[in-house]
Amino acid sequence: MLKWLFKVLFKFNGWHLHTPSPVDARNCIMVAAPHTSNWDFVYAISALDQLGLSPRFTIKKEFSKFPILGGMITALGAIWIDRSPKKEGEKRLSMTQIMVSLFDTSKEDMSVLVTPEGTRSKVTNWKTGFYYTALEAKVPICLAFMDYATHTTGVGMCFMPTGNMEADMKIIMDYYKDVTPKYPSGFSTDIRYAG
């Protein structure tokens, strides 16, 4: 039901799909950028569904407490994550360890959608856990985009991380530097790797 509604909104607002999607996008870490609006999620889920992809995504477990909302978000592919502060002496896996474990134990291909900006507000340093996850899980990094200037969205390219993080991150920053977000003042590529 929700995916159907998202598709109606996608079409009604004039969005178009960039096709075809790389084959690697079925088992990957999928970077989604720019992320400056809650609408990005609606359009991204609709686009990826139309491309035949069913990515999973992480979300705070607190949202699962709302029965109807939690159920709908789970149906969209949510992976519930405990982001509460650790208690003294508590042992808990890092987000990267959790994600690698998901790939290692999955019996099917799995793509995990991540927004490395970590917020809809402008940041100049992206979170890099997605890179380490892809490297350790031995899965490609695929670059999904939403360009509000052209109303085009999709998965543009995939590549295997080489272990040379600086070089690989420069590829990612170069890819996103000309993509127009909904709110341009709220987006920046990671200045540490901008070419």
Q: Model-derived features: where do they sit?
A:
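Helix-enriched interaction subdomains in cytosolic or periplasmic regions
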Residues: 1-4
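Soluble catalytic domains of membrane acyltransferases
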Residues: 12, 16-178, 192-195
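Short, flexible loop/turn segments with low-complexity composition
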Residues: 182-193
